[in-house]
Every structure is written in structure tokens, then in C-alpha cells.
């Protein structure tokens, strides 16, 4: 038996498979992303997800088998989000001056994201629990799952909607901002980043951080505000209405 096949058989039967597959695929996707001058359509998260999902389907490996190893990377999502606070700390003077406008923008953006998703769900006559799963689509996936569970949605589906939303934001953000002629000076990067973090949570924030430090800092702020506001207001709104 060729050594590669022996290695594949060994890895696919152990938790090392998910960890190894995720790291290898992402490193290759990141290298391609760099070679393509960080083109939005070459987003490494998008192509990593598509490659791994296609590989699991082609090899008939179950998701629990894959996640047994990938969970070690999943654990790092929390520290990675917390690390976004450092660029914000470096810009604390700007935050003090604009906290009111930023909070209002976060409220408006979060409301628009949830309301538009619910309206589309009802317009297409989707099942009620699917519609509820759309409400937290612009919040990072673990939080979206918790919110969906509280309001009667499907947590796993909410996570899928959140990831897809983040990818769409990361892919389309630059083109939309350029079309709207959002400037690329310091205030413009702040606005771009805040919008990406509001609409695309962690995936959008990661894209913003790759492009500009100011954009990344304010995307991280928007991500945190959306987590806080959505966790409080979405369950409250469904309880009232």
C-alpha cells in the first residue's frame, strides 16, 4: 500500500484528520489569496469551507469525525475575537468622541439586518422555525446559535446563515463601498470597517483587518456591539411581539 494511502487511512480514523485537513487547506487557500493580491473573491475562508465540505462529501467522512479534530481550532475563535480589542484600545480617544454615533449606527445596522432577513423569509413563505433562524444572521455563529435556540429557531441552521452572511459581506464589501464612493482616508476606513463588522461579524472583521488597521479595529467594535445588542434585543423583541 502506498505511504500516502497509509497516512490517509491513519489520519481519517483519528482526531488528527480534522485538525490536519483544516490547517493544510487553509494554509494553501491563504497562499493562493496572497498570490492573487487579496482579491475579495479569493477569500481563504470561503475556499477552505468549500474545499473541506467537498472533501468530506467525496470521501464519505462524517462531520462529527471531522470536528473531533477541528474543535481544537474552533476553540481559538474566542481568543481571536478578544484579540480584536487591542486595536480598539489604541484608538480609544476616537471612541470617546464618537461613541454615540457608533452605538446608533450599530443599532440601525443590526435592526436592518434582522428585519430584512425576516421580511425575506416571510415573503418566500419559509417555515416558521427557518425564518426565526434568519434573525441573528449578522451575529457571529456561536452567538447566533444561542439566540436562535432562545427564540425557537434551529441553532445549526442559524450558524449556516451566519457563516454565509459573513462570507457574502467579505466578498462584496469592497465592491459596494467603491460603488458608493466611500473614501479611503482614516474616517472612510473606519466607516468601511464598522459596516463590515456590523453586517459580516467575525468573517467581515477578518477581511477588514487584512485591508486596513483602522477598518479592522472598527469592525471588531461593530462585531462586539452586535453580539451584545442582538443577544439582548432579539429575544426581547420576539417575547414582546
Predicted regions and their residues:
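Hydrophobic alpha-helical transmembrane segments of integral membrane proteins
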Residues: 41, 45, 71, 76-78, ...
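Internal active-site segments that recognize and position negatively charged phosphoryl groups
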Residues: 90-167
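Helical membrane-embedded segments and adjacent short helical loop/helix-boundary regions
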Residues: 6-22, 29-89, 94, 100-101, ...
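Transmembrane alpha-helical segments of multi-pass membrane transport proteins and ion-pumping complexes
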Residues: 18-31, 49, 53, 57, ...
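Juxtamembrane helix-boundary/capping and inter-helix hinge elements in multi-pass membrane proteins
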Residues: 37-38, 61, 88-100, 124-129, ...
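Short, contiguous, pocket-lining structural segments
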Residues: 16-20, 24, 43-46, 168, ...
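Alpha-helical membrane segments and immediately flanking helix-loop junctions
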Residues: 130-157, 161-164, 186-225
Amino acid at each position: 500500500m502506498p505511504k500516502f494511502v497509509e497516512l490517509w487511512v491513519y489520519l481519517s480514523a483519528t482526531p488528527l484528520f480534522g485538525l490536519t485537513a483544516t490547517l493544510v487547506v487553509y494554509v494553501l487557500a491563504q497562499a493562493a489569496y496572497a498570490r492573487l493580491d487579496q482579491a475579495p473573491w479569493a477569500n481563504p475562508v470561503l475556499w477552505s469551507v468549500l474545499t473541506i465540505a467537498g472533501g468530506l462529501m467525496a470521501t464519505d467522512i462524517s462531520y462529527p469525525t471531522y470536528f473531533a479534530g477541528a474543535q481544537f481550532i474552533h476553540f481559538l475563535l474566542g481568543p481571536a475575537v478578544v484579540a480584536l480589542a487591542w486595536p480598539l484600545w489604541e484608538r480609544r480617544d476616537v471612541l470617546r468622541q464618537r461613541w454615540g454615533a457608533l452605538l446608533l449606527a450599530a443599532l440601525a445596522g443590526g435592526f436592518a439586518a434582522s428585519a430584512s432577513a425576516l421580511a425575506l423569509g416571510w415573503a418566500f413563505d419559509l417555515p416558521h422555525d427557518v425564518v426565526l433562524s434568519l434573525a441573528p444572521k449578522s451575529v457571529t455563529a456561536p452567538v447566533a446559535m444561542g439566540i436562535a435556540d432562545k427564540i425557537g429557531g434551529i441553532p445549526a441552521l442559524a450558524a449556516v446563515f451566519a457563516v454565509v452572511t459573513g462570507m457574502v459581506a467579505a466578498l462584496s464589501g469592497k465592491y459596494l463601498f467603491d460603488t458608493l464612493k466611500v473614501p479611503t482616508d482614516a474616517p472612510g476606513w473606519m466607516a468601511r470597517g464598522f459596516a463590515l463588522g456590523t453586517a459580516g461579524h467575525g468573517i467581515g472583521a477578518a477581511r477588514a483587518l487584512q485591508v486596513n488597521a483602522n477598518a479592522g479595529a472598527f469592525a471588531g467594535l461593530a462585531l462586539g456591539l452586535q453580539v451584545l445588542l442582538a443577544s439582548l434585543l432579539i429575544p426581547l423583541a420576539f417575547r414582546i411581539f
